[in-house]
Amino acid sequence: FTAGAVWSPAVDAPFLRRFSVSLDYYKIEVTDVVGTIGVPTILASCFNADGSNPGLSNANFYCQQFSRLASGQITGVAQTQVNLASVKTSGIDAQVDWGFDLADLGLPETAGALAFNLVISRLDSFERQARPNAAFVDYAGTIGADLSGGALPEWKSVLSATWAVGPVKTTLRWRHIAAMTDARSVPTFSPTAVNTPDYDVYDLSGSWKIDDRVTLRAGVNNLADQDPPYFTSYPNSNTDPSSFDILGRRVFVGINAKF
């Protein structure tokens, strides 16, 4: 289920005329999830690392997913689409918008206006079963190839601050992703695990509305040229390009024109 609320103060204070807060809570369970099981999980489960095959039977579901020579050497692993039992997740999404004219601080009307926007997400839980009737394992705050979505930070946020003076706007944006634990350390610690630290990226952009038809814009993404965190458990790469900026600092310019 989901529940949400929006609050805008009904007061005539200059600083609160353009202030609003929204909160959304979700708690969702999906059954018979279709996906693939990671190779480390297949091998560990076949050899009973998590209690999945106490008899070490070759007929075990996980053992049937890879082939071996008579010597025991593994020659291939099948990662087919299977029903992965259930996924349960819960969390909170929030957004805060606030804006005011700098004249409210006693500055001249020509000083312009400030506007702030904060979008923040808190992931309370992301529990997954490896197979039907298996125990749920909570992957909230982890990152790794065996997860649906790859990166599951407990906290992530985007904060933007915009200063507008007449036709000119300047925006500074801060993107934050909280530190995460290598999913290979869940539920038991892995000595080869590589965790990721807090990740922060800043973007700077501006625009100039020349008239009702033409607007110029320019900016710099990843202002500090922040490298993505390195970890080894993501498939075919050493980071998660869907979560982290892999291109580094880059400049853009553009023009919007209406005819």
Name these PLM-found stretches:
Residues 114-209, 224:
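C-terminal beta-barrel architecture of Gram-negative outer-membrane proteins
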Residues 1-62, 88:
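Membrane-embedded beta-barrel scaffold of Gram-negative outer-membrane proteins
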Residues 3, 17-23, 94, 112-118, ...:
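Transmembrane beta-strands of outer-membrane beta-barrel proteins
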Residues 7-9, 98-100, 163-165, 174, ...:
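Residue-level signature of outer-membrane beta-barrel architecture
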Residues 29-32, 124-127, 173-185, 207-259:
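C-terminal beta-signal and adjacent terminal beta-strands/loops
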Residues 1, 88-92, 153-157, 198-202, ...:
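Residues that define the transmembrane beta-barrel architecture of outer-membrane proteins
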Residues 38-89, 128-131, 150, 162, ...:
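Flexible glycine-rich, low-complexity coil/linker segments exposed to the extracellular/periplasmic environment
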